[in-house]
């Protein structure tokens, strides 16, 4: 397998996924009570309850005759800084059927909907100092409740690393004026404009190229809920530009304040420290509403071949070697691998093309203890190239086509999910399969249909097929994407709800089906598409995720291959969001490939 230099995360919004139940948010007026659900800023009176209820029986004696409540202030915006929490005193008023409106604050319970933003001490709200965000303030007594929005805007001026050229005192004052010198405008290089990030990755670098000799910069992140500025010199010169990795606390301030609230605007301003100011273009950076879970395993050829593991959300999130070659356990490299859907088991192929000895691990927490590690190729029943697990991890399907016998190539084998051994079950096909995939709902197998045989790892001129479960077996193959001259469609992978697949598509150079850059491996011209698992379905190019970054300089041939879904769907506004990893040769800003 040729080297794949990088792994990208793509966010996909599944707007057709309905939420279980609905949450209705109103305008948060916080006005006089009326019938409602108590979550939209309006209060609730007795008529808003089902059945006949004597309100006086559920109220303290001082509130007998209460008919409605309201809260002040309404729809409040407060400023939070790392040095000082925001505070706000709230008052709740009651309307009675036999006396004037009165302050009833001491009789009600006050709380915020999002407790990570702060708490009430009596009727006084006090925020945390670590981040801002959006929440609702709720007040209630007996059958009555009232709510109002609360906006906490996080404001911070942070200083970058120290250098031999110290920052000026209060550097934010240097940037107080308007831009005066366009020649000082930096070029913002990374992150890519329009990127969405998981809030818990805790790693973000900003790359830029200075202009006009400037060496004092303001990295500004701005949003209705945030004004976060970092003042910095070019502390890490890289490829003619500058790189700054956000401190973990800064990343959390940024992500926890704005997750799920839409794009943050990133702009870099530069000063010549003599009154001249210039600004870069503005890029949008968005943080997803919910954290990405689990981790990702991937194969690398950097610094020796290995299967690597990266755990999202770790305090120190760095890739670690999971399995590597030439140690006491493995006589050669392992590359292609398949993880069970519960993340507990893994099956691997050893030796690459024309080898395919199986390595099986029933417990990924103990990678030193292989359950099955075939020493040679004598047992043809223990050779695989690609594999895919059923939903409960009790078995996996596998293919191996690096043999001369066509009937053996045209076969899907099933293996025991506890031992890794091949079962006495298989499916004979009228074509050679590769890149086997089992849907999360267990009802479909998908695969590449090989047009021109080479090896299972590098098949030419593929289409895509699916097979549907019929009772205890799978039915005849159905063509989702037919084989087409000069194009290779390969490596399907199902979304968590099995409603569609992503796959790689390569257009062959000069229409040559047998070109090395069109062999279903790390093809330079590969792009990521999505398609429903139905005959004749129309593929959709994932243009936003597949677009080039600044340093790619418009090059759209980025070797985007082997897309893999995270198994977890997350809330994102009114829809659902899932993440896809893609191997790629795209440039990591100023750091280049890899």
Kindly give the residue locations of the regions a language model identified.
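Bacterial N-terminal signal peptides that target proteins for export
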Residues: 1-8
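A generic structural signal for short, non-catalytic loop/turn and secondary-structure boundary residues
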Residues: 9, 62-64, 181
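C-terminal motif of bacterial Sec signal peptides marking the signal peptidase cleavage site
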Residues: 15-18
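Extracytoplasmic soluble-region selector
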Residues: 23-26, 30, 40, 50-171, ...
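Sequence signature of WD/YWTD-type beta-propeller architectures
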Residues: 155-594
């Amino acid at each position: 397998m040729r080297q794949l230099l990088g792994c990208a995360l793509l966010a996909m919004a599944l707007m057709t996924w309905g939420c279980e139940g609905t949450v209705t948010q109103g305008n948060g007026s916080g006005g006089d009570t009326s019938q409602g659900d108590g979550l939209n800023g309006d209060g609730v009176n007795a008529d808003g309850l089902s059945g006949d209820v004597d309100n006086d029986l559920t109220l303290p004696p001082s509130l007998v005759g209460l008919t409605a409540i309201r809260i002040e202030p309404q729809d409040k915006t407060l400023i939070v800084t790392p040095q000082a929490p925001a505070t706000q005193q709230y008052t709740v008023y009651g309307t009675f059927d036999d006396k004037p409106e009165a302050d009833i604050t001491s009789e009600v319970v006050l709380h915020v909907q999002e407790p990570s933003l702060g708490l009430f001490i009596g009727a006084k709200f006090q925020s945390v100092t670590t981040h801002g965000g959006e929440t609702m303030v709720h007040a209630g007594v007996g059958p009555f409740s009232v709510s109002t929005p609360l906006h906490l805007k996080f404001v911070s001026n942070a200083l970058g690393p120290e250098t031999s050229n110290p920052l000026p005192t209060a550097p934010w004052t240097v940037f107080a004026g308007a831009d005066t010198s366009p020649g000082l405008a930096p070029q913002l290089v990374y992150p890519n404009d329009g990127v969405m990030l998981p809030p818990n990755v805790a790693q973000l670098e900003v790359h830029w190229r200075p202009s006009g000799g400037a060496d004092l910069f303001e990295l500004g992140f701005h949003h209705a809920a945030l004004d976060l500025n970092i003042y910095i010199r070019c502390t890490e010169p890289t490829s003619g530009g500058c790189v700054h990795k956000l401190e973990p606390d800064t990343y959390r301030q940024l992500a926890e304040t704005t997750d799920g609230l839409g794009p943050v605007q990133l702009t870099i301003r530069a000063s010549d420290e003599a009154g001249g100011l210039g600004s870069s273009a503005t890029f949008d950076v968005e943080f997803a509403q919910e954290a990405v879970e689990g981790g990702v395993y991937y194969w690398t050829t950097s610094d020796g071949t290995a299967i690597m593991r990266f755990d999202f959300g770790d305090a120190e999130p760095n890739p670690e070697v999971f399995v590597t070659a030439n140690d006491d356990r493995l006589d050669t490299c392992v590359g292609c691998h398949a993880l069970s859907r519960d993340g507990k088991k893994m099956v691997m192929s050893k030796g690459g093309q024309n080898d395919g000895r199986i390595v099986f691990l029933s417990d990924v927490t103990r990678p030193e203890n292989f359950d099955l590690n075939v020493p040679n190729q004598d047992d043809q029943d223990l050779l695989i190239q690609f594999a895919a697990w059923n939903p409960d991890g009790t078995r996996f399907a596998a293919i191996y086509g690096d043999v001369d016998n066509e009937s053996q190539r045209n076969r899907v084998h099933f293996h025991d999910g506890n031992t890794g051994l091949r079962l006495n079950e298989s499916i004979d096909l009228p074509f050679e399969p590769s890149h086997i995939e089992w849907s999360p709902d267990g009802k479909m197998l998908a695969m590449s249909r090989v047009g021109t045989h080479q090896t299972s790892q590098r098949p030419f001129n593929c289409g895509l097929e699916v097979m549907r479960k019929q009772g205890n077996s799978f039915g005849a193959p159905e063509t989702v994407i037919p084989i087409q001259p000069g194009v290779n469609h390969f490596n399907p992978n199902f979304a968590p709800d099995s409603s569609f697949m992503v796959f790689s598509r390569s257009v062959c150079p000069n229409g040559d089906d047998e070109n090395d850059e069109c062999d279903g491996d790390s093809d330079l011209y590969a792009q990521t598409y999505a398609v429903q698992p139905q005959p004749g379905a129309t593929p959709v190019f994932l243009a936003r995720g597949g677009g080039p970054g600044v340093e790619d300089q418009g090059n759209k041939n980025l070797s985007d291959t082997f897309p893999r879904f995270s198994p977890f769907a997350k809330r994102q506004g009114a829809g659902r969001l899932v993440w896809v990893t893609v191997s790629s040769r795209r440039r990591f800003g100023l750091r280049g490939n890899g």
